[in-house]
Amino acid sequence: QAELAQIPKQGQVIIIANHPLGSLDGIGLLDAILSIRPDAKIVVNELLMHVERLQPFALPVDNMSNQTSRQQLRAIQSHLAIGGALIMFPAGEVSRWRLSGIRDGQWNSSFVRLALRYHAPIVPVLVGGRNSRFFYCLSLVIKPLSTAWLIREMFKHRNARISAHIGSPITY
């Protein structure tokens, strides 16, 4: 709770985080941020727009085929332009097993461009947690099926506490 004080209470801000669990870490982070920033919105895979309770807080993008529309990008830009808090997962997908261990994939640098354009501080968040060994093995063999399997992983973690460490704002 004390680390939430790192997040500016007003004005545009971009909150970035790793993505170890999938939608569960996003929902948990959004819930925590909303407690101090009722204007917070989260950039999500457009498939999550089917979750009605998430819709008021979500800014969808098509990160499956990298075909995010201009309208979707404008919605993100408009939110920052009015001084909103924006939560992003720069990897664009859940962490997976790699030779270096369980890590996010390469981060998209769009959050840096947005921060520069809108003079928004960047607040880094390190989210803890892991999915099952089965998930990571499945993602090595059949990545699309492992993405669908994330729903099952989410229910395994439903009563767990998700740890998150919020860093100091990085200004341009």
Residue ranges and their predicted role:
Residues Q1, D62-Q67, S100-G101:
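Short, flexible loop segments at the rims of nucleotide/cofactor-binding pockets, characterized by
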Residues Q1-V13:
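A short, well-structured juxtamembrane/interface segment
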Residues V13-Q67:
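Catalytic core of membrane glycerolipid acyltransferases/transacylases, capturing the structured
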Residues H19-S23, V94-S95, R130:
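Gly/Ser/Thr-rich loops at beta-strand to alpha-helix junctions
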Residues A32, S78, R113-A115:
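Hydrophobic/aromatic ligand-binding patch that stacks against planar heteroaromatic rings
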Residues S65-Q72, R103-S109:
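Active-site glycine-rich loop that binds ribose-phosphate moieties when present
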Residues H79-E93:
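A structural motif
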Residues A85, W97-Y172:
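A cross-family acyltransferase "interaction/gating" segment
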